[in-house]
Amino acid sequence: MPFSKAWRSAVYPDFREQGAYINYKATKDTLHRMKEDIANPATPDELYNSLLMQKATVYKWCENKVKELQMMAEALMKASDYLSEEETPTNMSMVFSMVGSSEAKYLPPSDARRVADAITYELLRFVECRNLNTDTIEHIIARMYRYAVLGPTGDRWKNINKEYDYHALSIDEIFFMLSKVYEHVNEVESMRRDGRSSIPCGTVGSQVFDRRSVKYWVHMQDLPFVIARIIPHLPLSTFQDTYAMSKERGVPFTLGSPISSVYYDNDKFLLYHRRLERLDGATLIRMRWYGRPLDSDWNKLESKDSVFMEIKVHHEAWSGERSNKRRFALKEKDVDAYIRGDLSLKPALEKLRSKNASEAEQEKFMSLATEILTKIHAYDLKPVLRTQCQRAAFQCGLDQSIRISIDTDLRVVAEDFGLSHHWRYNGADAPLSHFPYAVVEVKLQCAENERIAPWIEELMNCRYMESVPKFSKYAHGIATLYGHTPFIKMVPYWMPQLDIDIRASTKPEYNQWDPTIGIASGCWERTTDRVIFGTGHAQTQTVGASEARFLPRTDCLRTYQRVLKAIKRGAHMNSVAPTMSPTDRPPSDEKKLTEQQELAPVVQYDTDRRHKAYTAFHLYPYCEDGVESLCFTSTGGKHVAAEVFSGLIPWQTGKRIRVPQKYDPKTLLTSERFMVKWAEQATRVGVVGLAVIRFGNSMSLPNDMVAVHSFWRANFHIVLGSLMVVVAECVLVYAYVTFKSRSRRVYARRKIRYDDRRGPVALTFVILAVILITVMMHVMVRYGPMLTGSDTF
């Protein structure tokens, strides 16, 4: 079977020897017995017990592997405190064997980065192993529905994913320590390169934001691969030392901190609809607060905590203004009075004056506070929705040129429309919905045509990120919780597509996809498209993305093993003789550990081994080499009565989510003008041909045509005119087909060529041939007798 072959190709041999995988072959034998004896109730029990036992073994292995990776990352983080500015050759084994001792040695930044890459590589291999086990269990349960009479019934089958849940083993702490290591390495390299330290992280920046941002969905299986691409370049940005806090409290560490927002709208959801329509000046008003890190109660808010009053205004490009977000802070106890219009802003102004704020800043504050309050009262806005998530931000201090945020555990909660006479609902029984993916937002501050960093281009184009432009938590929450009501006239384009599988293992790399597939449907359209534009792959990868390579080294596994053995060696030495120096320790122990440290030859496996196996055996859920429809339309579901804004949604190559596109009218007008030019010339040729047929006279041919057959002498003008009409009709058909093919390509907005490859070439050669033949005929008539010496030439 394809999955069986793909599974054998996807496993890591070294992990398999350690018992890291569900044994699919043994489980498949049980499934075959179930298929042969379909009514035997004992077989599902046998399968369940077998899966549970194997999951227990895998969970134990995952637990030990996470501890090993944490030990490695912690040792590297301690060693990164002793980075040297000089790239002097160092024995890494000696450095890591002395970590934590008084004789710790300095580590060059390049070696620290190399070890961090090795740990990242092993961590991603662990994630791939875990994901393959999940895919295996899902495949087994799916086959049970085919072979068992009633399928996997009972609560135990529903909860099998919760038993020995290896996904619950957090790797956030490992990513945090690796982020710290990369940050130290980048700081040392920056000091050596520029002679000055970089901007410290965690510094509070401006409160006015003006960025271009792109949002992506990331499946939770693929999130570690995205984080691993970010931390070598951007450190985790936090306002508090959450890692130290988690150690003090004895609670698990998480990369993100809770963020909650309460959105305001009226009974008819006016702001929601204006936001979806992308009207110029569309406004969004919300109250946002930042929860305490590591606190399980995200709704907890004390009276002295700050709540930010925020307003977001959308502006179209033609208006000359940029969309912006502005905000100011109030204490929680003052929010209700502010919304009612009973709060005096004089104390806030006095506080600004005490901080030596300029008159312009004071005026901006008053203008913003008045604008938000005016809109709340003018549109009768009420609290309608609350969004909550864990946000991890990656940014280099005050440098906001690149900022990446990752929102996980996103949930949307219904508010009470102000019935409690409070700015937010404090009850615990509100309707709630969880968003299935992580939301990654890449925020850039750069000029329109400025080239961004290659690693950013590689990240934005990798298959782990599913681009969903203009994704809005507020729009998603309203459509999810209120989409069935008659007040919602339209829903966002992504709502009918939430069930699409966006896992990276089920789709090829963007730059490896043939962008011409799927544009045309039917044999005729495909044939004409390939005749006009060719069949070769287009350049779908940007120059910057092609320059960036993730984990380019080929010795990551060997480096990992060497450092791991050095750390174990140091731990053993410290446990045997903690008070002895390395020179005083027995030589027999040194020799024994040196022998244990000798490495066997290792193979560098790919971190995307599972994806390559799925690709080789065509385990994609969609047809990758056939033709899908160009447009997506909703055919059912609870949003069937609502309009999917806006209209038909074109299919973007290599991506699962189809995104509405905006088209520049000049693009389509240029294509039409191209067709009109060809049609104009074809019409002239056709009219001349018709005139030759109607008014031509073959009797007026030159005297040297007298010897021609009488039929051709009588009908030469008809033949000539007919040929001209046929040529004109062919040119008209060609112009129309080219126009339609180019329009489809413009509509699909793909990175492929729009130019006509064969038409101009053929036209050029035809004109050259006509000119050459004409010149040759005139030369032969005038100089032929002289050159040949014959009057009959």
UniProtKB/Swiss-Prot annotation:
Regions that span the bilayer: 685-705, 718-738, 761-781
The keyword ATP-binding belongs to this UniProt entry's keyword annotation: yes
Record keywords: ATP-binding, Manganese, Membrane, Metal-binding, Nucleotide-binding, Transferase, Transmembrane, Transmembrane helix
Binding site for ATP: K215, R286, R288, K312, K325, R391
Deleted gene: phenotype: Is considerably less virulent in mice. Reduces short chain polyP levels and results in accumulation of PPi.
Co-factor requirement: Mn(2+)
Gene3D superfamilies: VTC, catalytic tunnel domain (3.20.100.30)
Family label: Belongs to the VTC4 family.
Oligomeric and partner information: The VTC core complex is an integral membrane heterooligomer composed of at least the catalytic subunit vtc4 and the accessory subunits vtc1 and vtc2. vtc1 is a small membrane protein without hydrophilic domain. Vtc2 and vtc4 are related and have 2 hydrophilic domains that face the cytosol, an N-terminal SPX domain and the central core domain. The central core in vtc4 is the catalytic domain.
Name of the protein in its database record: Vacuolar transporter chaperone complex subunit 4
Organism: Trypanosoma brucei brucei (strain 927/4 GUTat10.1)
